[in-house]
Amino acid sequence: MDRIIEKLDHGWWVVSHEQKLWLPKGELPYGEAANFDLVGQRALQIGEWQGEPVWLVQLQRRHDMGSVRQVIDLDVGLFQLAGRGVQLAEFYRSHKYCGYCGHEMYPSKTEWAMLCSHCRERYYPQIAPCIIVAIRRDDSILLAQHTRHRNGVHTVLAGFVEVGETLEQAVAREVMEESGIKVKNLRYVTSQPWPFPQSLMTAFMAEYDSGEIVIDPKELLEANWYRYDDLPLLPPPGTVARRLIEDTVAMCRAEYE
């Protein structure tokens, strides 16, 4: 439940509006509310980091509003809390009125949900499940440059899970659609909440089975097999894509060195 911010309130401040994050001096604000001119605003505690509260403030600042990507180098736990705040702020902003009856809604006091004051419908933050997979063939890994990544970064394949589809089916479909190959021996690795805008990445490793690379030009600029010790520009540390690549490289080193 949110409340009015008081002078001595302190902690981490996730100040967010329209999927943007307030980053004075390029950093996530930390300290007393008075130092950031937040006294009198409303805040919702969304977690704790190293014993300090993390607050969500739904507010637009005139300056220094940036992307949560700018704080990806934070400790994983704090980055995830910042992402949670951005997603919750957008959820509350976009659910002011009921999609069924059009009446005004209000936030639940017991959970992250919005309740309709008329028909009693209950809405929760939307989460979009995605798969991301590292595909290995002998001493090489399949890496691709996506159309949305025109900075030379090469990464593993990924995509959204469709309605009525299992995660395993999503991997097989996305890999075939984007690269034209089949995979086998699929293994779950980890997951990562990814607030761009509201994804949950489920990460897998797989082995090449058959087929030749035929890219989908709507999704990829190019794709190729890269030997583990001769890789192109990779995604930044802290991303699940980077972890998958590094795990694959470690497996190759263990076998080929």
UniProtKB/Swiss-Prot annotation:
Amino acids binding a divalent metal cation 1: 158, 178, 219
Cellular component aspect of the GO annotation: cytosol
EC number(s) stated in the UniProt entry for this protein: 3.6.1.-, 3.6.1.22
GO biological process: NAD catabolic process; NADH metabolic process; NADP catabolic process
Motif residue range(s): Nudix box: 159-180
Family, as annotated: Belongs to the Nudix hydrolase family. NudC subfamily.
Complex and partners: Homodimer.
Name of the protein: NAD-capped RNA hydrolase NudC
